[in-house]
């Protein structure tokens, strides 16, 4: 595990302890039960059926490695732009300390469109999954580098019991093998090296042979051009999670359409 990931996980555990005091779990469960769910996996498959790329478009203000990506940051406006220009789903950063995200950003983005929404955060505790459902998320992220296999299995079971889709994220072959023990069809391959922070789409390409046909490969990070998209689609990768390239553009949705459609 990288030093930055170690630090983030330590902060997350502290955040959970504090949140449990201000919003007890049973209170969150009640709130979660009143929320509707949008079909995250179904939205991706609908794009595939239509012969289109399925793009999970990210609402992300900043990152630890790049700093602020977008000064004019209005989540509702960004969400509407993505929906208008063909996004399948949204991914919204809710981590405050490292990515300048917010639960409010997820709520605002989801309210502004009809797309399913992934809570993009560092999940280390069951509390965060119930919390995700309560805030209106339709899917959660599990990062293999941050969790033991048994933890991922338990967290996935809880998420599925609440109606949430699960995207499991891997960085290398060992993590991929662990992720394939889960039930989720969504296998995210992060092209960013956790030690150097460099990105290469070769990471995704190098793992494809090991992934069963019934899984949906989601390529993440480092997809910056139409050429990257065309190369990956030629390798039968049709699901993409993209943030930085869109966030740096004047009009995120227009950049989405330019790169993918």
UniProtKB/Swiss-Prot annotation:
GO MF, one example: indole-3-glycerol-phosphate synthase activity
Pathway, per record: Amino-acid biosynthesis; L-tryptophan biosynthesis; L-tryptophan from chorismate: step 4/5
Keyword Amino-acid biosynthesis: yes
Chemical reaction(s) catalysed: 1-(2-carboxyphenylamino)-1-deoxy-D-ribulose 5-phosphate + H(+) = (1S,2R)-1-C-(indol-3-yl)glycerol 3-phosphate + CO2 + H2O
Lyase is among the record's keywords: yes
PROSITE patterns: IGPS
Enzyme Commission no: 4.1.1.48
Superkingdom of the source species: Bacteria
Annotated Pfam families: IGPS (PF00218)
InterPro entries: Aldolase_TIM, Indole-3-glycerol_P_synth, Indole-3-glycerol_P_synth_dom, Indole-3-GlycerolPSynthase_CS, RibuloseP-bd_barrel
Enzyme type, top EC level: lyase
Gene Ontology biological-process entries: L-tryptophan biosynthetic process
Record keywords: Amino-acid biosynthesis, Aromatic amino acid biosynthesis, Decarboxylase, Lyase, Tryptophan biosynthesis
Record family assignment: Belongs to the TrpC family.
Protein name: Indole-3-glycerol phosphate synthase
Source organism of this protein record: Paraburkholderia phytofirmans (strain DSM 17436 / LMG 22146 / PsJN) (Burkholderia phytofirmans)
């Amino acid at each position: 595990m990288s030093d930055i990931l170690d630090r983030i996980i330590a902060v997350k555990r502290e955040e959970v302890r504090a949140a449990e005091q201000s919003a007890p779990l049973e209170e969150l469960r009640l709130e979660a039960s009143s929320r509707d769910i949008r079909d995250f996996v179904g939205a991706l498959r609908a794009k595939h059926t239509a012969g289109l790329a399925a793009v999970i478009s990210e609402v992300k203000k900043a990152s630890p490695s790049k700093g602020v990506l977008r000064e004019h940051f209005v989540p509702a406006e960004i969400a509407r732009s993505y929906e208008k220009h063909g996004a399948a789903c949204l991914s919204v950063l809710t981590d405050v300390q490292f990515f300048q995200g917010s639960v409010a950003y997820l709520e605002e983005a989801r309210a502004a469109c009809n797309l399913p929404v992934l809570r993009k955060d560092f999940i280390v505790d069951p509390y965060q999954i119930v919390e995700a459902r309560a805030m209106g998320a339709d899917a959660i992220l599990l990062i293999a580098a941050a969790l033991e296999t048994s933890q991922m299995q338990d967290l996935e079971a809880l998420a599925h019991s609440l109606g949430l889709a699960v995207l499991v994220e891997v960085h290398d072959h060992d993590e991929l093998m662990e992720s394939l023990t889960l039930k989720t069809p969504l296998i995210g391959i992060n092209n960013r090296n956790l030690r150097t922070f460099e990105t290469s789409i070769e990471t995704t390409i190098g793992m494809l042979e090991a992934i069963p046909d019934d899984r949906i490969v989601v390529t993440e990070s480092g997809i910056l051009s139409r050429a990257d998209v065309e190369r990956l689609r030629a390798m039968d990768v049709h699901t993409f999670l993209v943030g930085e390239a869109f966030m740096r553009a004047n009009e995120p949705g227009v950049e989405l359409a330019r790169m993918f459609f």
